[in-house]
C-alpha cells in the first residue's frame, strides 16, 4: 500500500459554484470521492487537500517527500505565477501530473503559460473533473511498474 497526494490550489473550494459553464457543477467533494475510490480499489491511500494559500501547498509538497509515490496537482491560478510551487515540486523525487479542469490553452492568453508543467511528467487539461482520475490512474500504473 502506497500513498498518493492530490493538491488543489486557489478557488477550487468553490468548484460547482464558481463559473460552472467553465468548471462544471461537480464539487471538490465529488472529485475527492472519485479519487478515493480509485486509490482504494488499487489498494492505496490518498492525501487530498485544497488551499487558497500558496505556502500551504508548498508545505504539503514538502511533507510528501519520501512518503508519497506521486502528486497530482491542480495549482489553479498559481499555475501561471508560482515559481515557489515549481521549486517545491523540483525537490519532490516522485512523478507529478498537472491537472486543469478547463483547457487553459483555449482561455485568456495569460493562462497559457504554466510554471508547473516544466516539472510535470504529464499535463491534463480540458477533461473536466475526469482529468483527476486519469492522472491518478497513471501515477498508480507508474508505481506498479516500478515496484
Curated annotation (Swiss-Prot):
InterPro entries: DHquinase_II, DHquinase_II_CS, DHquinase_II_sf. The keyword GTP-binding does not apply. It holds the Pfam family DHquinase_II. This is 3-dehydroquinate dehydratase 2. It catalyses: 3-dehydroquinate = 3-dehydroshikimate + H2O. The lineage of its organism: Bacteria, Pseudomonadati, Pseudomonadota, Alphaproteobacteria, Hyphomicrobiales. GO terms for biological process: amino acid biosynthetic process; aromatic amino acid family biosynthetic process; chorismate biosynthetic process; quinate catabolic process. Homododecamer. The record marks 18 as: Transition state stabilizer. Substrate binds at residues 74, 80, 87, 101-102, 111.
Amino acid at each position: 500500500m502506497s500513498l498518493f497526494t492530490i493538491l488543489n490550489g486557489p478557488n477550487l473550494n468553490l468548484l460547482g459554484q464558481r463559473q460552472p459553464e467553465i468548471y462544471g457543477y461537480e464539487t471538490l467533494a465529488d472529485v475527492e470521492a472519485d479519487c478515493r475510490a480509485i486509490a482504494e480499489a488499487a489498494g492505496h491511500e490518498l492525501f487530498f487537500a485544497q488551499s487558497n494559500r500558496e505556502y500551504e501547498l508548498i508545505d504539503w509538497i514538502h511533507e510528501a517527500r519520501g512518503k508519497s509515490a506521486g502528486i497530482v496537482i491542480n495549482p489553479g491560478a498559481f499555475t501561471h505565477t508560482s515559481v515557489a510551487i515549481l521549486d517545491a515540486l523540483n525537490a519532490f523525487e516522485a512523478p507529478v501530473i498537472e491537472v486543469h479542469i478547463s483547457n487553459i490553452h483555449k482561455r485568456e492568453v495569460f493562462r497559457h503559460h504554466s510554471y508547473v508543467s516544466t516539472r510535470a511528467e504529464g499535463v491534463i487539461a480540458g477533461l473536466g473533473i475526469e482529468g483527476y482520475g486519469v492522472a491518478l490512474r497513471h501515477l498508480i500504473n507508474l508505481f506498479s511498474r516500478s515496484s
